[in-house]
């Protein structure tokens, strides 16, 4: 069970603006190496981003650029699976290095197919760590998140009794074929309603839809129609 877990933090809404990277190297399921670096994104910092991760322009004034540390990153990833918690980290690195050719694995796709309680919501890193008694350290520190994400992946593989190589076939399967749903939640909160179930032959069965803008019907009704 050899893989490298990666996490990045950004200075602003542009995925390219990486200001910190964290790397956790796992071998045979054990954490054997960690590495992190602040990054000068050569871009501005948004207040909201700094409020989340605590990194400011002053912190990265003398930090290397993402190009400066690329060789160190490649050295640690090598031919291993590059495990990330959601596709954002992959997008951020690909924005900086369009030719990057890592063997990516999105841990959230494994998580959502492992535990029924987080199949459709609640699969954020902090919540999944809490459910599995994993200490996350300082959330939104890139290294702490990388280590925690790697431990979550190991928990998921152990829960499913799978090897790392089995993940590819697992995440190709629709969640709905693995996690059973049958009815609308009883007494739902109309602001935060969850529609469970649906027509297995429906066009969007097993997918996640997001309604934006004004609709010609209440969102609850639209959700029910979409599930059919």
Question: Which stretches of residues belong to each language-model region?
Answer:
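Conserved non-catalytic scaffold segment of RNase H-like nuclease domains
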Residues: 1-103, 122-140
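Short, glycine/acidic-enriched loop or turn micro-motifs at the edges of active sites
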Residues: 10-12, 109, 148
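Short coil/turn segments
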Residues: 42, 114-118, 215
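Acidic, Mg2+-coordinating catalytic module of metal-dependent nucleases/exonucleases
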Residues: 81-87, 91-92, 96, 124-186
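Short, structured loop/turn "capping" segments at alpha-beta junctions
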Residues: 103-105, 121, 160-165, 202
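Short alpha-helix plus adjacent loop in nuclease-associated cores
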Residues: 105-126
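DNA strand-break repair and replication-stress modules
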Residues: 162-228
């Amino acid at each position: 069970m050899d893989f490298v877990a990666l996490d990045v933090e950004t200075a602003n809404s542009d995925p390219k603006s990486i200001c910190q990277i964290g790397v956790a190297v796992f071998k045979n399921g054990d954490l054997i190496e960690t590495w992190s670096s602040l990054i000068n994104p050569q871009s501005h910092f948004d207040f909201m981003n700094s409020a989340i991760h605590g990194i400011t322009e002053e912190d990265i004034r003398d930090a290397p650029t993402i190009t400066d540390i690329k060789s160190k990153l490649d050295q640690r990833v090598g031919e291993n699976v590059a495990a990330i918690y959601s596709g954002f980290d992959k997008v951020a690195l690909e924005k900086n290095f369009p030719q990057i050719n890592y063997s990516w694995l999105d841990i959230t796709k494994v998580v959502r197919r492992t535990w029924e309680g987080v199949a459709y919501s609640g699969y954020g890193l902090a919540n999944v760590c809490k459910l599995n008694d994993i200490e996350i350290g300082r959330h939104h520190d890139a290294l702490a998140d990388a280590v925690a994400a790697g431990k979550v992946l190991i928990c998921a593989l152990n829960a499913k009794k799978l090897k790392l190589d089995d993940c590819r076939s697992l995440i190709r399967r629709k969640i709905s074929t693995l996690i059973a749903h049958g009815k609308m939640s009883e007494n739902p909160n109309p602001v935060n309603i969850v529609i469970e179930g649906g027509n297995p032959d429906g066009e969007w069965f097993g997918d996640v839809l997001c309604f934006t803008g004004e609709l010609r019907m209440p969102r609850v009704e639209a959700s029910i129609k979409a599930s059919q």
